Regions:
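Short phosphate-binding loop-to-helix
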Residues: 63-121
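Hydrophobic/aromatic residues located in beta-strands of well-ordered beta-sheets
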Residues: 12, 55-58, 104, 170, ...
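N-terminal glycine-rich phosphate-binding loop and ensuing alpha1 helix
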Residues: 3, 8-60, 116
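Conserved core of the sugar-phosphate nucleotidyltransferase
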Residues: 114-215
Length: 275
């Protein structure tokens, strides 16, 4: 069990695999002249500076990605290619730190448009005692929900939605859009839909992260392809932190079409690259 009283700086881990089934080699692919990894590393560095007492680390199983991360001036942890998820990769990377951290934020390596302030805010929520597991969500207005529905017709496993209790506790996550909405025409008179979308961002205490790495994958986790369901299937509480995100924010880069849309978003809305 980790001891928070003898911990090192908090850690932002960026898991980055080369062997994506839908978009092989994606950490090294470029969006508007910068690699996907470069964009996410810049987000991590800016967030660490905002949060304070925090370091950034890329966790990978690929020498090419490790070399590129070194060029970007970020620490690297080499992990086994046999690890079954980015969260387990983050856990193994945290253990390699000379002074393992008390808190870890897992910033997915395919999420190049998350504002650094959102990442820093999640770390700060963990420090305030938000719980053992926390994640960021944002409520969709109707145009955003319509865009998500259209996107899922092309890429049904892109984008994750969440059902929350009144106190912010996550009840469920799904690659389907939940909840189903009855009497939508009436609800559309309100500015916001009842759908919350999940960002590719998680925070854990070391105790929760170590438990996850040792636990077997859950049944619904495997069906949905969502790591966080391992916690819910085993009775853990996940706190959801509502955040504000830019209207043009995209979900993770999973397909060649996502890459093209990311290029288009930058062309239309400007480049959010920190720096």
């Amino acid at each position: 069990m980790s001891d928070p009283h003898n911990a090192g700086p908090d850690l932002i881990v960026i898991p980055a695999r080369n062997a994506s089934t839908r978009l092989p080699g994606k950490p090294l692919l470029k969006i508007a002249g910068r690699s996907l990894l470069e964009r996410v590393v810049a987000i991590g560095k800016a967030a660490a500076a905002q949060a304070g007492d925090c370091q950034v680390l890329v966790a990978t199983d690929d020498d090419r990605i490790a070399g590129h991360a070194a060029e970007l001036g970020v620490a690297v942890a080499m992990t086994s290619p046999d690890l079954d998820s980015g969260t387990v990769r983050a856990a193994h990377a945290a253990r390699e730190c000379a002074s393992p951290p008390a808190r870890v934020v897992n910033l997915q390596g395919d999420a190049p448009f998350i504002p650094p302030g959102v990442v820093a805010g999640l770390m700060q929520a963990l420090r305030r005692g938000a719980g053992d597991v926390a994640t960021a969500v944002f409520q969709l207005d109707w145009p955003r929900l319509d865009r998500l529905r259209a996107h899922k017709r092309e890429a049904p496993f892109s984008g994750t939605t969440c059902i929350r209790a009144a106190d912010g506790r996550a009840l469920w996550f799904s690659k389907s859009i939940i909840p189903a909405i009855r009497d939508e025409a009436r609800l559309r008179q309100q500015p916001l839909s009842p759908v919350w979308q999940h960002l590719g961002l998680y925070g854990y205490t070391r105790a929760a992260l170590d438990w996850f790495a040792a636990a077997a994958p859950g049944h619904y986790e495997a069906l949905e392809g969502l790591e966080q369901l391992r916690f819910l299937e085993n009775g853990w509480r996940i706190d959801t932190i509502p955040v504000e995100v830019p209207p043009h924010l995209l979900s993770g880069i999973d397909t060649p079409e996502d890459l093209a849309k990311a290029e288009q978003a930058i062309a239309c809305n400007g480049d959010p690259f920190p720096g």
